[in-house]
Amino acid sequence: DADITVAFEVSLPELFTVTSAEYEAMHGAWCKAIKVLPHYSVVHKQDWFCSEKYQPELQKDDLSFLDRSFERHFNERPYLSHKCYLFLTKTTKERARQQSNFSTLCRGRITPKELNHEMVVKFMESVEQFERIINDNIKLRRLSDNELVGTEKDSGLIEKYMSLTMDDVTCLEDIDLDARQMRIGDKMLCLHTLSDTDDLPAKVSTDN
């Protein structure tokens, strides 16, 4: 619908490696960064968890005896692979009132009237400020056009999203949507979505 979106890959700290003080600092950074975005901005964070099997790297020449034993020990063990992405989108006041089943393709004008060059410049400046604030605690890396739409050799994020895989080479498969399940190829999809502030706690804190 002609909205502007900037995509990032987020590198989060390992599980159980963050102290209470560091967690509070990260939470404060998120709150501070979100406040610099203009009105009618959408912050969309995605966490992808894919079931995979560990593939050892036994072909490396510099592995010690313990390293090789470690690789063999975890060979083909199942685990959840995690990827995190962040999307910052600039919408308009009119767009914010629209329902999810509305499409501007049914209208004579696709680009919103409020969207202009000055608004785009201000939004991109706020995105850069957002990025600087978050990078003090969490690593953000802006995705390029090729990483989003792909190239002739490598799949982009959109193709991976539509095929439920993180592989560099993807194959688009049939998508089955019904009232009870969502399936892409032979893979089942499970979504946990939060879009209403009433579903969130009033306060976020750590246990001291």
Residue ranges and their predicted role:
Residues 1-208:
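Extended, folded cores of ATP/NTP-driven motor/assembly subunits in large transport
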